[in-house]
């Protein structure tokens, strides 16, 4: 029997272990997409307790607790923090087979040196012991980042953000991790949402411009793009339930924008035309700045309207959509490519049925001298588990070049989530090690080890052109 969460966790043979211990384990981390707060990094305040550090904002855990029948009072409600933690501890054993079970125990082991399964029998002891440790200097947000061997972090930021805390961090010589903003213009694109006019008004306030025409709106967005670029931004990020593509000209887009600001209803086709126009315009702007464009495709968000009204978005009521994406993705990428304005692009899909669609799509759009210009992104959200990661890796390898893959990201709001990179690295080494053991690859460990290191760190640093700003 293999011991639970041993040093050789997920490493099944000598090849897995050599790849992991010799090549993967000690590679730095570039967490190029996450939802950490730059303000919390800057302020670097100790966490009050484990609920604040571990459960706050974590809709993965909230969702599991709801599925286990925990009352909302003990999830997002007014129950004392200790009672919320104990409710989570009681839920943990029920998460077997879910990555939450592994993540929970990897995080406890990595940061708190706790090696036993967490459950209802020891939750109170774990609460007390971990809370004592959280008051130590080694458990502040910055210390946790540095202890995790992180070199760079890509946050997720609205175009109207002042980037005040990014500026403070960039000027702080005592913190050596690069905290880089990411331009996330969902508010500009989601013209169908009730909040669209308010977002345009906010952009108007930030830029000091009247945004009553599409030209003025684009000019304001361009100002913000330049502002983000001046503060180190290397990429954009887009949430897409479906990829938009309907042929459109500028005059149509201007008319649609005016209608929306006049509070006139838009058809679905008009919504898609506007999004197609703006995504094309943004893609050109990203390419001109040398940015990476990220698409997160296929999530059906806020499905429970009752809970959306009660708790707001991003609270655990999203799921996998089944929309058709192949045609629109190809058309939108091609529209940019034929104009010589396709930036480096990462395509993530939450629906694993689309894996081969995107893994094959990336080979359509290459550029002479550029390795892996368009990437099939890491297994995301509901795929962020052993089977999902293996499937993403093998699907990519089957129809593309796994060796050029830019690897793992946390997509997390927690400073304790970096063991997910170790989880990924073990799965990667297990996969390649199994190919060696089965005779599918020769035992050229230096060659495969270099590919492992590239996937863990080197490729993403090259891809985001960060060689001059991060250290090995």
Swiss-Prot record:
PANTHER family: URONATE ISOMERASE
Family: Belongs to the metallo-dependent hydrolases superfamily. Uronate isomerase family.
Record's keyword annotation contains DNA damage: no
The reaction(s) this protein catalyses: D-glucuronate = D-fructuronate; aldehydo-D-galacturonate = keto-D-tagaturonate
Organism, as annotated: Halalkalibacterium halodurans (strain ATCC BAA-125 / DSM 18197 / FERM 7344 / JCM 9153 / C-125)
GO terms, biological process: D-galacturonate catabolic process; D-glucuronate catabolic process
Gene3D superfamilies: Metal-dependent hydrolases, uronate isomerase, domain 2, chain A
Domain of life: Bacteria
Coiled-coil intervals, chain numbering: none
GO molecular function: glucuronate isomerase activity
Residues that span the membrane, as ranges: none
Pathway assigned in UniProt: Carbohydrate metabolism; pentose and glucuronate interconversion
Record's protein name: Uronate isomerase
């Amino acid at each position: 029997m293999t011991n639970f969460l041993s040093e050789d966790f997920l490493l099944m043979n000598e090849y897995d272990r050599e790849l992991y211990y010799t090549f993967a384990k000690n590679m730095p981390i570039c967490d190029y997409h996450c939802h950490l707060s730059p303000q919390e990094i800057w302020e670097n305040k100790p966490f009050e307790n484990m609920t604040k550090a571990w459960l706050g904002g974590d809709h993965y855990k909230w969702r599991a607790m709801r599925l286990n029948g925990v009352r909302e009072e003990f999830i997002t409600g007014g129950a004392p923090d200790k009672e919320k933690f104990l409710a989570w501890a009681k839920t943990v054993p029920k998460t077997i087979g879910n990555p939450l079970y592994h993540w929970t125990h990897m995080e406890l082991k990595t940061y708190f040196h706790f090696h036993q399964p967490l459950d209802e029998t020891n939750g109170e002891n774990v609460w007390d012991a971990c809370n004592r440790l959280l008051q130590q200097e080694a458990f502040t947000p910055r210390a946790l980042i540095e202890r995790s061997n992180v070199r760079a972090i890509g946050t997720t930021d609205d175009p109207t953000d002042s980037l005040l805390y990014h500026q403070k961090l960039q000027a702080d010589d005592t913190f050596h991790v690069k905290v880089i903003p990411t331009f996330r213009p969902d508010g500009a694109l989601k013209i169908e949402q009730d909040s669209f006019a308010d977002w345009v008004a906010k952009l108007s306030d930030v830029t000091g411009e009247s945004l009553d025409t599409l030209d003025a709106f684009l000019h304001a967005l361009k100002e913000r793009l330049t502002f983000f670029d001046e503060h180190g931004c290397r990429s954009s990020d887009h949430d897409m339930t479906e990829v938009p593509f309907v042929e459109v000209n500028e005059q149509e887009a201007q008319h649609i924008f005016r209608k929306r600001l006049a509070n006139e209803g838009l058809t679905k086709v008009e919504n898609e035309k506007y999004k197609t126009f703006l995504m094309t315009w943004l893609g050109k702007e990203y390419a001109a700045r040398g940015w990476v464009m990220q698409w997160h495709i296929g999530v059906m968000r806020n499905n429970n309207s009752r809970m959306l009204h009660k708790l707001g978005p991003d609270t655990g009521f999203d799921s996998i959509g089944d929309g058709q994406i192949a045609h629109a993705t190809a058309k939108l990428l091609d529209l940019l490519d034929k104009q010589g304005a396709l930036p480096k692009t990462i395509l993530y899909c939450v629906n694993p049925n689309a894996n081969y669609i995107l893994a094959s799509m990336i080979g359509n759009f290459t550029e002479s001298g550029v390795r892996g210009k368009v990437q099939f992104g890491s297994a995301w959200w509901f795929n962020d588990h052993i089977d999902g990661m293996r499937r993403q890796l093998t699907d990519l390898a089957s129809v593309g070049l796994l060796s050029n893959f830019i690897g793992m990201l946390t997509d997390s709001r927690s400073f304790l989530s970096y063991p997910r990179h170790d989880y990924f690295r073990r799965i990667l080494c297990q996969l390649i090690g199994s190919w060696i053991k089965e005779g599918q690859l020769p035992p050229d460990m230096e060659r495969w080890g270099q590919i492992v290191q590239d996937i863990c760190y080197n490729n993403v640093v090259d891809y985001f052109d960060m060689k001059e700003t991060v250290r090995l």
